[in-house]
A protein has these predicted regions:
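Multi-pass membrane proteins that catalyze or facilitate reactions on polyprenyl-/lipid-phosphate substrates
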Residues: 2-24, 30-169, 173-297
Length: 297
């Protein structure tokens, strides 16, 4: 029975990781927001910042989520791209449901009696930041499909990884949208698709070019995650109410920003019904995963 319970726990954590991973490759959707919605944000931040002090404990906590994120990114990159290109509204409402389904645990973290001017300002400013990002016209931004790699470009990829990873773990801020605004989104996601396809077909020769781009990007991601995680942990310890109000502003604005970014086209009854269904599915998934999380986030 203990073994079955352990397997169930790990599968639950891997599934959350899949959701977080998929969120990180969609412009306008935040992996950090999904961490909050899944009820694991504080646990993951603590494990990252205490990786060297509590090495095995942190590895044990992080591993299933990392595995899930890799599965989500590699397995669903093509599917999500297809969904956004052909069924953008239902795809985005799925993630809006995932966001809103996990809001309750975050709200419970805020001590309403301690809400003051600083907390209100943090909420308003960060809410406005996400709306501003949502208003950016992603269709007008030039994104190269491929990049010729050299020493200078590798350094740029490391820096991009640092910026993108930092935004990936800040709730409400989309690392993919930041990459798109900087003009590198198509190149990075294209490399991920190529690598995933080559891995699936065990084609080592085809892995060379995407690895050349993704490896320095991955190094930057690791460096960026540690830096931002340390900052977030310090803020939640020093200014918990203002910090969580700010996080709530980031998360609460995300569905609106995502809708702003969505190309509605010509709405039909079938499309609206599909959007409602995917929203309900996303909401239910987030609610259930947050409910069964060990962390009462």
């Amino acid at each position: 029975m203990k073994l079955l319970a352990l397997i169930k726990t790990y599968l639950n954590q891997i599934l959350r990781g899949v959701v977080i991973g998929v969120a990180n490759i969609i412009p306008g959707v935040s992996g950090g927001t999904m961490m909050v919605s899944m009820g694991v944000y504080d646990t993951l931040i603590h494990s990252i910042t205490h990786l060297f002090k509590e090495f095995w404990k942190s590895i044990k906590a992080l591993l299933p989520y990392v595995v899930g994120m890799l599965i989500g990114i590699l397995a669903f990159a093509s599917l999500i791209s297809w969904g956004l290109e052909n069924h953008e509204l239902p795809t985005n409402t799925l993630f809006i449901g995932l966001i809103l389904g996990g809001l309750s645990p975050l709200i419970k973290k805020i001590d309403r009696k301690k809400i003051g001017p600083a907390a209100i300002i943090a909420f308003v400013l960060l809410f406005a930041l996400i709306i501003w990002m949502g208003l950016q016209n992603k269709d007008s931004i030039q994104n190269a499909d491929t990049i010729d790699m050299n020493a200078g470009q590798m350094l740029i990829m490391v820096l991009l990884g640092m910026v993108a990873s930092g935004t990936m773990i800040i709730p409400g801020v989309s690392g993919s949208l930041v990459l798109m605004l900087l003009g590198y989104y198509k190149a990075v996601t294209g490399a991920l698709k190529t690598f995933g396809h080559a891995l699936l077909h065990v084609d080592f020769a085809a892995m060379g070019q995407p690895v050349l781009m993704l490896l320095p990007f991955l190094i930057g991601i690791v460096l960026g995650i540690f830096g931002v995680a340390k900052l977030i942990e310090w803020l939640t310890a020093k200014y918990p109410t203002a910090t969580y109000c700010g996080v709530l502003g980031l998360v609460a604005a995300s569905p609106l920003a995502l809708l702003i970014q969505t190309n509605m086209g010509s709405l039909s009854v079938g499309l609206v019904v599909a959007a409602v269904i995917t929203f309900a599915i996303g909401f239910a998934i987030a609610w259930l995963l947050a409910k069964h999380s060990k962390e009462d986030a």
